[in-house]
């Protein structure tokens, strides 16, 4: 199993939630103090360096017009990390290509970072959450189709090495593609795609890309991974799906005693409890298929999922639903082990190890305790060459 330290680079110094309508899209940027923001970036970058020092890989992502993730140009930060680090794999998850007008530019950015890092890039792509539509001045209709067409164009740009080539799609048209530099890795960096739906996972599996899912827990993750495996096999990849093709993101905090661990986990939970979003930004018309809208409505009505992505969620409830792992090293190892077997195995653990008011020392404690006391056991227990899906049924049936 590979582990990746992940922070959304949040800006938590906000007034009480009652004083604003939404933390995303419309929150006035007069609330952002650039001096405090600069200090935050200094510490976030240092925490990624510490993760590398402890043998943990690095992950970052991109969002727009929100205090929950002040990283609107993730490739810039990734380029800085390419020069500030030396051995960690660098995952961006990811590029919101359905909202980018020029996929070839994304191909160039990723190729350049791959060269700067001497082949350590893991290039991830995301459809983008609904709250990204307005900031991108984008159209939510046919977003998924744009996403996949853009990714096809990017891969073509990376792998066409004999002079200009052209691309004629439904949404993108390019007559002279000939990027310099080309990627350091051949034929191109590993490709990741994130999705939280079974339908999306089947497409990722059919392409053979690495599938990541975020905070889908005990309830949602098995169907997503099953769909990935089905798509993989139907595309003729192989009968067996390696666990290293699957990734899971969760909030993770580890400390040497229960009191410290719980205190850190409570602060980490800010990521979901502070995420106040106006209803009209959460599901713009055309973003989701009708069937998905029905399921979301049923889920909210039944108390499933996060509803308004957090609300009154507690750390104990988050552990119970599989969106958080926290505690002493022994407890966290057992929590991850239980989840691993329930979902049929995964080879990449994306650790949201910093959020909200979790300070630098607390974040570093969590990184180091995980890296030294939990990660070696995970690597021994769950080898990268394991096969996903074996034993999943019996494990799931015990819950």
How would you describe each model-predicted region?
Residues 1-88, 189, 388-392:
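N-terminal beta1-alpha1-beta2 module of alpha/beta enzyme domains
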Residues 3, 62, 81, 113, ...:
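Conserved, mostly hydrophobic/aromatic
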Residues 3-7, 58-60, 90-93, 121-125, ...:
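Hydrophobic faces of well-ordered beta-strands that scaffold small-molecule active sites
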Residues 5-32, 141-180, 220-343, 379-399:
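An alpha-helical appendage that flanks or caps ligand/catalytic pockets
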Residues 28-42, 94-104, 185-195, 252-255, ...:
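Active-site mouth loops of central-metabolism enzymes
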Residues 49-53, 78-87, 110, 114-121, ...:
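Acidic (Asp/Glu)-rich catalytic clusters
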Residues 59-77, 97, 215-216, 351-362:
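Glycine-rich, proline-tolerant flexible connector loops at the mouths of alpha/beta enzymes
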